[in-house]
A protein has these predicted regions:
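Compositionally biased, intrinsically disordered or flexible polar/acidic segments
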Residues: 1-184
Length: 184
């Protein structure tokens, strides 16, 4: 049974996660979460140390996966697939993902939400500038000074698409400049 007016939470959903026609998706990672099948039937693989590494890798007593993982139970505006957006990773400039791929041009889709700033705030809360970071692919910045809150507010789904050329068989995603903490 659902709470009264629960359906209002789905009013402004968009098909953000639907795979783009004409593309073969090699990796879908649920950053900070377990395997997840979205409303389009697409599998998002568990985030683990097969592809990612964080600051915690420098400490033998810490699990490098769990050390930079968090979750929220808040509903996510703009998507029916809340669970995918409710898990996230952080790790400043030491968080990175490495994917073996054939050399060539790749379309990379990033999905973000602001999980903390604005929690419990009124509609007039302004959290712009409290989380700013760069996203790089193979050492080239593709998203400069990304401010998730400025893009979609608190608990709003945000999608960014970039293109990158891979040489050497490895697609590396990292965060070379973190001015105020990232959340993926």
């Amino acid at each position: 049974e659902q709470a009264p007016h629960f359906g209002i939470l789905y009013q402004d959903t968009k098909p953000l996660l639907k795979g783009e026609d004409g593309y073969n998706y090699l990796y879908r990672i649920n950053c900070g979460g377990d395997d997840f099948t979205d409303s389009f039937g697409q599998l998002w693989m568990q985030d683990n140390t097969n592809y990612s590494r964080s600051w915690a890798a420098s400490f033998n007593e810490l699990n490098p996966y769990l050390a930079s993982q968090r979750t929220t139970n808040d509903p996510i505006r703009g998507s029916r697939d809340w669970k995918l957006f409710q898990y996230f990773r952080f790790g400043r400039h030491q968080l990175e993902y490495n994917f073996p791929v054939a050399d060539g041009m790749y379309r990379i889709e990033f999905y973000f939400t602001e999980p903390w700033h604005g929690t419990g705030g009124s509609a007039s809360a302004d959290c712009e500038g409290l989380r700013i970071f760069d996203v790089a692919v193979n050492d080239s910045v593709v998203l400069d000074d990304l401010d998730i809150w400025a893009e979609s507010g608190h608990d709003g789904a945000c999608k960014k698409v970039v293109y990158a050329i891979v040489k050497g068989g490895l697609l590396k995603i990292h965060f070379p400049e973190v001015k105020a903490g990232q959340a993926l």
